[in-house]
Regions:
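Intrinsically disordered, low-complexity Ser/Thr/Pro/Gly-rich regulatory segments
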Residues: 1-366
Length: 366
């Protein structure tokens, strides 16, 4: 009976950990078989799942999460997962904050909490918050630090993951989707531009094309954030190029590139352009986004759809998504004439202006 209860207990917390991981999918944009720093993404997730399940079980039992021996932890997880202890050790290290990487992770405010913290050469402290909040964002940052070349060389794989996540919103057979990126060429044969994803709705005759931007979920400096912004806004040229191509050749020609059999029976009557960033899509400065397209982040899309895919009975999903994104206002921009806030710090006062322009106006008016 005790063995049966223990097995049932383990199965319960395994399911609970799996549920936690499913909710964290947005944090890591690499496919399971991608290998970075000696481990596949699947191995990192398997190790994290074990850690989450164990930590939740100990918490529910009322047991304090006391520091554990790293070597014993590695041996236990390697046995449970039937994996090479050396590989498991590398995965454990990637979830650990220590003296070597602390400054890197602390360089930017608001970063993900560490799942594990090294206390000495062989003892690791656990963090329930770190394990159950944004552990894969911590892992992403750490992999970039530990294996920068492999991390960047694998970045192209994130587009396919993003594409599959997008297509999961359109599961019904009424939708036809491009298998991969589509290149659009000029009459001379040179590439004009490309489209990352296409969805065609056979029920309504609407076609949506998507430019997908799979950014890093963080920037370590203003310069890096500016590069991310400029990379995103390069989509202006892509949107313009696709619309010019469509004006010349027609949406039905694009539908042929997506699925020639569908194009023989159906016609594309309306086109909706989209630009989606995995994490970033809205900036307070830089070039003006091409408003012929709907711009949004992936979390924004999930919020607008309540995390649900479109149903077979929905009237016009592509038009609905386009309208929701264009009407949504994710940036809460302060008005220029809003007064500065004052914060008391001892006998001093700190004035916080809504923008640099507001600060300059205040200084010039003195």
């Amino acid at each position: 009976n005790e063995l049966r209860e223990a097995g049932s207990d383990d199965a319960h917390y395994h399911r609970l950990a799996t549920t936690h991981l499913a909710g964290m999918a947005y944090q890591l944009g690499y496919p399971p078989d991608a290998e970075i720093d000696g481990c596949t993404i699947q191995t990192y997730c398997d190790v994290l799942s074990w850690l989450i399940g164990y930590a939740l079980r100990e918490r529910d039992r009322g047991e304090p999460l006391t520091p554990r021996s790293e070597s014993m932890l590695i041996a236990t997880i390697a046995s449970a997962l039937r994996a090479d202890p050396t590989v498991i050790g590398r995965a454990i290290t990637a979830f650990t904050l220590d003296g070597e990487n602390a400054a890197y992770h602390a360089a930017v405010p608001g970063v993900a909490s560490a799942p594990l913290v090294r206390l000495d050469a062989d003892r690791l402290a656990w963090s329930i918050h770190g394990l159950t909040s944004e552990p894969l964002l911590f892992l992403t940052r750490e992999l970039r630090r530990r294996a920068a070349e492999a991390y960047h060389n694998s970045a192209f794989l994130r587009e396919d993951v993003f594409r599959r996540d997008l297509y999961a919103l359109f599961p019904d057979k009424r939708f036809v989707m491009s298998a991969s990126r589509i290149e659009l060429r000029r009459e001379s044969g040179n590439i004009r531009t490309d489209i990352d994803a296409v969805v065609f709705d056979r029920k309504t005759g609407t076609l949506g094309f998507f430019e997908l931007k799979s950014q890093d979920p963080f920037a370590r400096s203003t310069a890096e954030l500016t590069r991310q912004r400029d990379n995103l806004l390069y989509a202006n040229r892509q949107v313009s190029g696709v619309l010019a191509w469509l004006q010349r050749y027609g949406a039905d020609e694009l539908l042929k590139r997506v699925d020639s059999r569908t194009a023989k029976t159906f016609r594309a009557h309306k086109v909706f352009p989209f630009v989606l960033g995995r994490y970033l899509a809205h900036f307070g400065d830089g070039a003006e986004p091409d408003r012929r397209a709907a711009w949004g982040t992936w979390p924004q899309v999930l919020r607008l759809l309540d995390g649900q895919s479109f149903r077979p009975t929905d009237a016009n999903p592509l038009a609905s998504l386009f309208n929701r994104l264009t009407r949504d206002t994710p940036l809460d921009l302060a008005t220029p004439d809003e007064p500065a806030r004052q914060i008391a710090i001892g006998r001093s006062r700190l004035r916080v202006h809504t923008s640099y322009a507001a600060y300059k106006t205040s200084v010039d008016s003195r």
